[in-house]
Amino acid sequence: MMITLRKLPLAVAVMAGIFAAQASAVDFKGYARSGIGWTGSGGEQQCFQATGAGAKYRLGNECETYAELKLGQEVWKEGDKSFYFDTNVAYSVAQQNDWEATSPAFREANVQGKNLIDALPGSTIWAGKRFYQRHDVHMIDFYYWDISGPGAGIENVDLGFGKLSVAATRSSEAGGSATFQSDSIYDYNKSTANDVFDVRLGSLEVNPGGTLELGVDYGRANARDDYYLADDATKDGWMFTAEHVQTIGTGFNKFVVQYATDALTSQGKGLSQGSGIGISDTDPKFAYAQNNNGHMLRLIDHGSISMGDRWDMMYVGMYQDIDWDNNNGTRWWTVGVRPMFKWTPIMSTLLEVGYDNVKSQRTDETNNQYKITLAQQWQAGDSIWSRPALRVFATYAKWDEKWGYDKTGNPSNNANYGYAVKDGFNGGSFGRGDNDEWTFGAQMEIWW
């Protein structure tokens, strides 16, 4: 009995050590932003985005509280073989009250197995919901290559001259498909599965400090058995991507060329859309039946550079032309810079200047917007990428819009529903007109 009692403290200590080791192995990562702002003409902070533009310049121009909370852990390891479990829950609220209830979005839940195939050392096989090899322009929060969703694949297969990745993901689309029951009664399905098949060849060393990544995505609607899509629904499409990344000191430059067809032109990032036919012709979702047959061309140059000890700068230039057979496409180009002057290793001043120009294919009219933000910031480090950051800001925006999208009524009583129309069409007001505004506030931003 005495021996048993003497062993008890040792057993407790060992178990405590095991649990402590397990607890420390949990990876807690994430992103969050939140703040408070006001509008010069009164009321809460407004945010400014040109009608038809796919994104907006974000510094001093974000009006929500948003967070992604990631928990992950390497749950098994033997030699160089391992399994990793990863999760991500995201939240977004309007930051107008203390208590703002919201249903979180379960963005990620996947398992990644590394070096499990002896013939393919260094590769990873995975399955589940995942943020998959996303490519974005941080300044405008624009994801130009992103097939995230439930899926499976194998990545980083070393071919000697580059690394191969293959994946399949899904994004179901509201609107759905229909089947005939009897006596002219149709049963409408609430969603249609859109499958995407993605192949990438990366890490191609093409010049000193420069690498090339090539990719192709094919997306298609996958209607249930005995269901059908609308006659004019877009059923499939392709997207081709080439991205060159050049190291410039401690910074980088990325040059991107993308070409997409049909179903992959709407979101323009590799996910398929355009298969739905709607619940009924009185439901706004019926507008999804407007097909997006056509093509998209996109050119992007963006990056971040350091100019001495005191100056950093982000920049972006982009041209995007969506040409649809139904003439409801757009031609959008944007250019912006965000220089940063560092007073101390943790205090800086930032100036963001951005311009958007969006021309409607249908109306031949143009919307444009200028946006300027001056911010004083305290951040954890002396890089333009250092976070967390606390900032106070003032933003000025001026816009002149000649067209907008007609969302009057519903598709059953408005033949133009969802289409671009000129401002003043049928006596209505479409777009934001010619105006300007300024806002000011404070914000925190963090990633870890």
UniProtKB/Swiss-Prot annotation:
GO terms for biological process: monoatomic ion transport. InterPro entries: G_neg_Bact_CarbUptk_Porin, Maltoporin, Porin_LamB, Porin_LamB_sf. GO terms for molecular function: maltodextrin transmembrane transporter activity; maltose transporting porin activity. Induction: By maltose. It is found in: Cell outer membrane. The record marks Y143 as: Important in sugar transport. Residues 1-25 form the signal peptide. It is a multi-pass membrane protein. Keywords: Cell outer membrane, Ion transport, Membrane, Porin, Signal, Sugar transport, Transmembrane, Transmembrane beta strand, Transport. Involved in the transport of maltose and maltodextrins. This is Maltoporin.
